[in-house]
A protein has these predicted regions:
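Transmembrane beta-barrel strands of outer-membrane/channel proteins
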Residues: 15-19, 45-49, 94-96, 137-139, ...
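Signature for the C-terminal beta-barrel architecture of outer-membrane proteins
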Residues: 7-12, 25, 42, 55-57, ...
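Short glycine/proline- and aromatic-enriched beta-strand/turn motifs that initiate or cap beta-hairpins
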Residues: 6-35
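Surface-exposed loop and membrane-interface regions of Gram-negative outer-membrane beta-barrel proteins
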Residues: 41-78, 105
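Short, solvent-exposed loop/edge-beta patches enriched in aromatic
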Residues: 34-43, 83-87
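Hydrophobic h-region of N-terminal signal peptides that target proteins for export
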Residues: 1-5
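Gram-negative (and chloroplast) outer-membrane scaffold detector with strong preference
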Residues: 73-89
Length: 178
């Protein structure tokens, strides 16, 4: 997959091109992923088209059946509030790079390694309160009853440049990719 990205204040967009195997057939993929910021809220969309020599794959844009809502929700790449470093930050959906604390146990974790064949809905949550206390949570996939990666951290910052924390990280489904 080839990815183009452009970071700016305001609307940002990334795009990718690649190939995907669906229903035993190989399709080319073109995707555009704009992020639409509305104040602290950010909505990442995943607008994609699969095509081959027979034409466009219709399954991803068919709103006529009973799965119209699921088809529409599938176009949401992520929903975010704030930015990392804010007192309250969370991102629900695709997690291309999530870090817990200083990154000793979890650094740049991604739940999109098998994307777009497997679409996970994860959570990266960070909250600071009373300027000294913090809570962090990373959950890899809400679509499964048993999570894969689950990471939590509670921190206390007694001084500006010192943070003490208690972290717990587990991969409940560690053999999944083997």
């Amino acid at each position: 997959t080839l990815i183009f990205a452009q970071e700016k204040e305001g609307v940002s967009t990334s795009a990718s091109m690649g190939s995907v195997t669906m229903d035993g057939k190989i399709y080319n993929q073109v995707a555009i992923r704009p992020e639409i910021p509305i104040g602290k809220l950010g909505l990442g969309l995943d607008v994609y088209v699969y095509f081959n020599d027979e034409g466009i794959y219709p399954g991803n844009w068919d709103f006529s059946d009973g799965n119209a809502f699921a088809t529409l929700v599938d176009k949401i790449y992520y929903l975010r509030w704030g930015k990392p470093g804010d007192n309250l930050y969370f991102k629900v959906g695709a997690l291309p790079s999530a870090t817990l604390g200083q990154g000793i146990l979890v650094n740049n974790y991604s739940n999109i390694m098998e994307y777009p064949q497997v679409r996970r809905v994860g959570l990266d949550f960070k909250m600071k309160f009373m300027k000294q206390f913090g809570v962090e949570l990373i959950h890899s996939n809400f679509k499964k009853t048993a999570p894969g990666v689950l990471a939590t951290r509670f921190s206390y910052d007694p001084f500006t440049r010192l943070s003490l924390g208690l972290s717990y990280v587990t991969d409940i489904d560690q053999n999944q990719g083997l």
